[in-house]
Amino acid sequence: MTAILERRESTSLWGRFCNWITSTENRLYIGWFGVLMIPTLLTATSVFIIAFIAAPPVDIDGIREPVSGSLLYGNNIISGAIIPTSAAIGLHFYPIWEAASVDEWLYNGGPYELIVLHFLLGVACYMGREWELSFRLGMRPWIAVAYSAPVAAATAVFLIYPIGQGSFSDGMPLGISGTFNFMIVFQAEHNILMHPFHMLGVAGVFGGSLFSAMHGSLVTSSLIRETTENESANEGYRFGQEEETYNIVAAHGYFGRLIFQYASFNNSRSLHFFLAAWPVVGIWFTALGISTMAFNLNGFNFNQSVVDSQGRVINTWADIINRANLGMEVMHERNAHNFPLDLAAVEAPSTNG
């Protein structure tokens, strides 16, 4: 009898690392995108927490008037924010080693640029990690495609808009009231409410909420009863069961009679594709709208577009919005310039004397 002993090849340390990184048996999948995602998101999160608590005021407008954003400098959870990098820095890459000191780096809002750039890289890698895990499990790639919508929106407000406006100081502050301030100023300067891409985004978000609520309530109302009246209907479901958990025919019939027949999906797959695609496409359009308005391709301007036979203006809601925009622009950066840009651009009347 002859025994053949096969020598087991020793796997290198790099090989074991590659196998561990790409293994779908791990409790949390890491993947090659995760190798970059983990340090970037940890860096962004750590600096955000420290800066939100203790960062000193930042000279956001570049006029030696620092704005406080951290908790230790008088703010609360609502008013606190990471103040964007100073207009004096503009679009320059501003890591710590480019400043003369850490104090100067903090005064010019260096943490904002650090957080934003690491965050955008991290969420892009998270999207790639979703695709990578789907690929290794033999799934279709639509999870990553859906996640591309919020990634595009974040990239638009944190990167594309500052590039178009010429300074990171125009980026969205990282805080609750800072976000509201960004929205108000954006409306004042770009008339975003009158931009069709923003309208599509509103339809996507509100429509997606409506469709999600309709779908969830229809499914919950047409569950196949597997329990007694004294038990929760949820107890009748077992994870991984092959049987349908709700009666799609009953849900289809109800909704078809509630509105009209063809308003109801009779294909569960096309229904769920629609539920995913509607808000995703809407948010894509919003991100595209922000990116175009970044370069001052603004919303529609219907100011003074209705006049009577004598040429007198008949005010419409467009004129009311325009007046509100001017008021918001007057209050924005009120110490950085004497007049809002729209008013300062008007040619001064000639004087005789």
UniProtKB/Swiss-Prot annotation:
Q: What GO molecular function terms would the record report?
A: chlorophyll binding; electron transporter, transferring electrons within the cyclic electron transport pathway of photosynthesis activity; iron ion binding; oxidoreductase activity, acting on diphenols and related substances as donors, oxygen as acceptor; oxygen evolving activity
Binding-site list for chlorophyll a PD1: H198
Q: Where is this site: Cleavage?
A: A344, A345
| Signal peptide (residue range) | none
Query: PROSITE patterns, alphabetically?
Result: REACTION_CENTER (PS00244)
Alphabetized Pfam families for the sequence: Photo_RC (PF00124)
PTMs per UniProt: Tyr-161 forms a radical intermediate that is referred to as redox-active TyrZ, YZ or Y-Z. C-terminally processed by CTPA; processing is essential to allow assembly of the oxygen-evolving complex and thus photosynthetic growth.
Query: Which UniProt keywords are given for this protein, alphabetically ordered?
Result: Acetylation, Calcium, Chlorophyll, Chloroplast, Chromophore, Electron transport, Herbicide resistance, Iron, Magnesium, Manganese, Membrane, Metal-binding, Oxidoreductase, Phosphoprotein, Photosynthesis, Photosystem II, Plastid, Thylakoid, Transmembrane, Transmembrane helix, Transport
- List the residue(s) that the UniProt entry marks as the site Tyrosine radical intermediate: Y161
Binding positions (pheophytin a): Y126
**CDD domains registered for this protein in UniProt:** Photosystem-II_D1
- Subcellular location, in the record's words? Plastid, Chloroplast thylakoid membrane
What InterPro entries has UniProt attached to this entry? Answer: D1/D2, Photo_II_D1/D2_sf, Photo_RC_L/M, Photo_RC_L/M_CS, PSII_D1
GO terms in the biological process aspect are: photosynthetic electron transport in photosystem II; response to herbicide
Q: Which reaction does it catalyse?
A: 2 a plastoquinone + 4 hnu + 2 H2O = 2 a plastoquinol + O2
Function according to Swiss-Prot or TrEMBL: Photosystem II (PSII) is a light-driven water:plastoquinone oxidoreductase that uses light energy to abstract electrons from H(2)O, generating O(2) and a proton gradient subsequently used for ATP formation. It consists of a core antenna complex that captures photons, and an electron transfer chain that converts photonic excitation into a charge separation. The D1/D2 (PsbA/PsbD) reaction center heterodimer binds P680, the primary electron donor of PSII as well as several subsequent electron acceptors.
**Would you identify the family this protein belongs to, as annotated?**
Belongs to the reaction center PufL/M/PsbA/D family.
What is the additional note?
Answer: 2 of the reaction center chlorophylls (ChlD1 and ChlD2) are entirely coordinated by water. Herbicides such as atrazine, BNT, diuron or ioxynil bind in the Q(B) binding site and block subsequent electron transfer.
What NCBIfam families does UniProt report for this protein, alphabetically? Answer: psbA
The record's subunit annotation is:
PSII is composed of 1 copy each of membrane proteins PsbA, PsbB, PsbC, PsbD, PsbE, PsbF, PsbH, PsbI, PsbJ, PsbK, PsbL, PsbM, PsbT, PsbX, PsbY, PsbZ, Psb30/Ycf12, at least 3 peripheral proteins of the oxygen-evolving complex and a large number of cofactors. It forms dimeric complexes.
Official protein name in the record: Photosystem II protein D1
Which organism does this sequence originate in? Answer: Magnolia fraseri var. pyramidata
Source organism phylogeny: Eukaryota, Viridiplantae, Streptophyta, Embryophyta, Tracheophyta
Designated gene of the protein: psbA
